């Protein structure tokens, strides 16, 4: 049992005065499991504010109270099961669904879920989304944006985790394989996609974003449901969820397409959740990388890495997300190193200095064409790809979970291999303004026909589609990404250096402004 000194301290500062005597609406008799008094008080307090739709208190409980109690009492054990909580909240089914969402998420995060728990969590998400979607009028539920994002994020994560778990057939007991075979529709890709697209449609979020992008009033097209923050934000977060899900399936075109109304270069009310912002840019950048749109990938990674640098202190206050964000940060520096090797570009000075600090040795190996290093960087930084279908349970047991990854790795490495000679050719072209084809072919120990093919490859690979304006990330203009261009006149290569001289004046001006701001802040102390 816990003492009175262990008062719940995660919610409102006035919690003890206002609720310490609150006994709840239901019977506190909860069977054989003895729910600690502090947890009872927390559940009563939590339930009361969910009923009252008190957004400020719910956010405080969600971001602070629940995590503090988890660290204190349930770091290595699950929270009490919902059946033991039900009497404390008069069997309130909506609250119990929300509680179970946190309950199963904690198990996934801190413990190892059983097959039954994976199934039960799926059914709980079905109950939650059915409650929100299968209604003729908006439901009376208010949740903070952070929780709404985490619901969508966790929903996709658990689908991904189950898909990989189901594909690891080696060393699985036969009875467990039989259970998986008999329940092939649980965590089915179609049901996951259906939920996300239904939330997008219910919220009319694409219509709202179209109106927002033209400086109109989104409320005019939001409809009965989309005007409510619950539906609006779930709709927006579902777009990001679809970006992630299509990327996990290897459909990068569709991944970018679902964001056709999202203007990434514009700060909006939708981009105030750091984890959502970082997830968006990571998956958009990765999709661009796999589509050979390296300049767009570099732009995305640079933008979000600069954002992480500037908000690092704020992100540290949310410790439950900080580790994952820092891992994404490292992954994106690796992906940026790959993109810069394949398509050298100028970077923001702050991002460039961090890249040198983190990836100098890797960059050197990548620039030398070390295929092993390309594979290592890709393996560490790519998403955990999944198959859209269950494995063949009747085939000999094997770990099929690596098949989607191996396919994407093969596609990526084939592209890298095709470009392996480009850095070498570029280094020679930089040295001359004209050069006979035969002479440069001799330098590279190639026959003339093979070298002509390599020059054509250079031209083709260094000309990419680049986004320039608008909200549709698939749009763009064909641009040459190389700082060295050339044309061939008969047997002579004519070379032009298109590199733009670095404007050092802008760099020094930025530093002067920073020091000026720092001086003003010091004077104000």
Swiss-Prot record:
Keywords: Cytoplasm, Initiation factor, Protein biosynthesis. Its main location: cytoplasm. GO terms for cellular component: eukaryotic 43S preinitiation complex; eukaryotic 48S preinitiation complex; eukaryotic translation initiation factor 3 complex. It comes from the Eukaryota. One of its GO terms (molecular function) is translation initiation factor activity. Disulfide bonds: none annotated. GO terms for biological process: formation of cytoplasmic translation initiation complex; translational initiation. Pfam families: Paf67. Component of the eukaryotic translation initiation factor 3 (eIF-3) complex, which is involved in protein synthesis of a specialized repertoire of mRNAs and, together with other initiation factors, stimulates binding of mRNA and methionyl-tRNAi to the 40S ribosome. The eIF-3 complex specifically targets and initiates translation of a subset of mRNAs involved in cell proliferation. Component of the eukaryotic translation initiation factor 3 (eIF-3) complex. Belongs to the eIF-3 subunit L family. This is Eukaryotic translation initiation factor 3 subunit L.
């Amino acid at each position: 049992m816990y003492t009175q000194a262990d008062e719940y301290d995660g919610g409102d500062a006035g919690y003890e005065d206002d609720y310490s005597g609150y006994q709840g609406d239901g019977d506190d008799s909860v069977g054989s499991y003895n729910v600690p008094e502090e947890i009872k008080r927390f559940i009563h307090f939590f339930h009361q504010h969910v009923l009252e739709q008190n957004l400020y208190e719910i956010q405080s409980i969600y971001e602070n109270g629940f995590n503090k109690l988890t660290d204190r009492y349930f770091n290595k054990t699950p929270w009490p099961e919902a059946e033991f909580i039900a009497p404390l909240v008069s069997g309130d089914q909506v609250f119990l669904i929300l509680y179970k969402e946190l309950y199963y998420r904690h198990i996934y995060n801190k413990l190892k879920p059983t097959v039954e728990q994976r199934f039960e969590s799926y059914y709980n998400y079905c109950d939650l989304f059915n409650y929100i979607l299968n209604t003729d009028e908006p439901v009376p539920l208010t949740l903070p944006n952070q929780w709404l994002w985490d619901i969508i994020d966790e929903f996709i994560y658990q689908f991904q985790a189950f898909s990989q778990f189901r594909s690891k057939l080696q060393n699985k007991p036969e009875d467990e394989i039989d259970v998986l075979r008999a329940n092939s529709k649980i965590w089915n890709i179609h049901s996951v996609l259906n939920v996300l697209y239904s939330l997008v449609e219910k919220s009319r979020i694409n219509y709202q974003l179209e109106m927002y992008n033209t400086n109109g009033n989104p409320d005019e097209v939001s409809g009965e449901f989309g005007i409510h923050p619950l539906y609006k934000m779930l709709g927006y977060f579902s777009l990001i969820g679809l970006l992630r899900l299509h990327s996990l399936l290897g459909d990068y075109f569709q991944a970018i397409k679902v964001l056709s109304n999202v203007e990434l270069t514009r700060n909006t009310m939708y981009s105030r959740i750091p984890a959502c912002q970082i997830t968006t840019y990571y998956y958009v950048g990765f999709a661009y990388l796999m589509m050979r749109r390296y300049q767009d990938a570099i732009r995305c990674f640079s933008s979000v890495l600069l954002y992480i640098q500037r908000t690092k202190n704020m992100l540290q206050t949310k410790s439950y997300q900080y580790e994952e964000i820092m891992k994404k940060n490292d992954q994106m520096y690796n992906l940026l190193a790959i993109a810069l090797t394949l398509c050298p570009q100028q970077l923001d000075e702050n991002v460039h200095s961090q890249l040198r600090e983190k990836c100098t040795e890797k960059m050197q190996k990548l620039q030398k064409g070390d295929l092993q290093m390309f594979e290592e960087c890709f393996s560490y930084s790519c998403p955990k790809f999944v198959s859209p279908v269950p494995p063949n349970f009747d085939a000999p047991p094997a770990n099929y979970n690596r098949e989607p990854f191996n396919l994407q790795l093969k596609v990526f490495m084939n592209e890298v291999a095709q470009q392996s000679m480009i850095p070498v050719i570029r280094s020679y072209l930089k040295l001359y303004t004209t050069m006979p084809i035969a002479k440069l072919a001799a330098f590279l120990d190639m026959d003339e026909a093979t070298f002509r093919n390599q020059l054509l490859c250079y031209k083709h690979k260094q000309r990419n589609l680049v986004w320039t304006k608008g909200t549709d990330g698939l749009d763009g203009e064909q641009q040459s990404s190389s700082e060295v261009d050339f044309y061939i006149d008969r047997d002579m290569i004519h070379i032009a250096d298109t590199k733009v001289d670095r404007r050092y004046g802008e760099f020094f001006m930025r530093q002067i402004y920073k020091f000026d701001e720092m001086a003003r802040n010091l004077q104000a102390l």
